[in-house]
Curated annotation (Swiss-Prot):
The active site is at 132. It comes from Burkholderia cenocepacia (strain HI2424). The lineage of its organism: Bacteria, Pseudomonadati, Pseudomonadota, Betaproteobacteria, Burkholderiales. This is Protease HtpX homolog. Binds 1 zinc ion per subunit. It holds the Pfam family Peptidase_M48.
């Protein structure tokens, strides 16, 4: 229930932001257009944002015939978690990473890169996919996917405003201060992600994944490997769509500056330490 409230609040906040931007660019007419655009974006984000994200990564759906071992692993873990079977996707990228998306557990999808399948052992892959299914079980996937698509839309609108400026309803040039304000919208998009996606969510998914797999150590060693390998392998699709970085099990961004705003992951060392403590004590708290 809390995630539903959080999602509704996020949509309302972004709608208000779009209206403000519309006013900066085109006065009252711009505000009306922005409101209609925001309502359309809200509808689109709820129903289609998962498909949009999967398309951004050129993810290919697989089944028991095309990726039998991986598909059966996800099915077994979904059964252990008492979840419906999600759609399963592979992304042809060398960088090791994975994410979950969808609007609810009944319409969920999990995706992994071909790189992560090469780097991790089967036991470690189980830990990673259990983590992603924990996101599904906790209903994190709707807000994370909507946030990614909305932040991307705001950044695109900011770029449009910076290049084309704007005029008010009387045809006069818009307030020059508005241009400066609009130029700051990309950082605002990053800030929205920081507010909406808490680092605590990753810790909870680590804990939930450990419960599903029954093997916290496998996720700990997987995170260590992903962290080490990912540092030297660029994830081109993620670099092109930095607003989606918060969906990944590990931050895929290597750039500095603006891209750091989209980093929402806790320190890998702390995640590993917590998981190893679970393995030592047998307590998933």
């Amino acid at each position: 229930m809390f995630n539903w409230v959080k999602t509704a609040m996020l949509m309302a906040a972004i709608t208000a932001l779009f209206i403000v931007i519309g006013g900066m660019i085109g006065g009252s007419r711009g505000m009306t257009i922005a409101l209609l655009f925001a309502l359309g974006m809200n509808f689109f984000s709820y129903w289609f944002s998962d498909k949009m994200v999967l398309r951004m990564y050129n993810a290919q759906e697989v089944d028991e015939n095309t990726a039998p071992q991986f598909y059966r692993m996800v099915r077994e873990l979904a059964t252990r978690a008492n979840l419906p079977m999600p759609r399963v996707y592979l992304i042809n990228e060398d960088a090791p990473n994975a994410f979950a998306t969808g609007r609810n557990p009944e319409h969920a999808a999990v995706a992994a890169t071909t790189g992560i399948l090469r780097v991790l052992s089967e036991r470690e892959m189980r830990g990673v996919m259990a983590h992603e299914l924990a996101h599904v079980k906790h209903r994190d996937i709707l807000i994370s996917t909507i946030t990614a698509t909305m932040a991307g839309a705001i950044s695109a609108l900011a770029n449009f405003a910076m290049f084309f400026g704007g005029r008010d309803e009387n045809g006069r040039p818009a307030n020059p201060i508005a241009g400066i304000a609009v130029a700051l919208l990309a950082p605002i998009a990053g800030a929205l992600i920081q507010m909406a996606i808490s680092r605590a969510r990753e810790f909870e998914a680590d804990r939930g994944g450990a419960q599903i797999s029954g093997d916290p150590q496998s996720l700990a060693t997987a995170l260590d490997k992903i962290h080490r390998y990912a540092a030297g392998i660029p994830f081109q699709a993620a670099e092109a769509h930095p607003a989606t970085a918060q969906m990944m099990i590990m931050n895929p961004l290597h750039g500095g500056g603006l891209q750091n705003l989209f980093s929402t992951h806790p320190a890998t060392e702390e995640r590993i330490a917590r998981l190893m403590e679970m393995a030592r004590t047998g307590r998933f708290e």
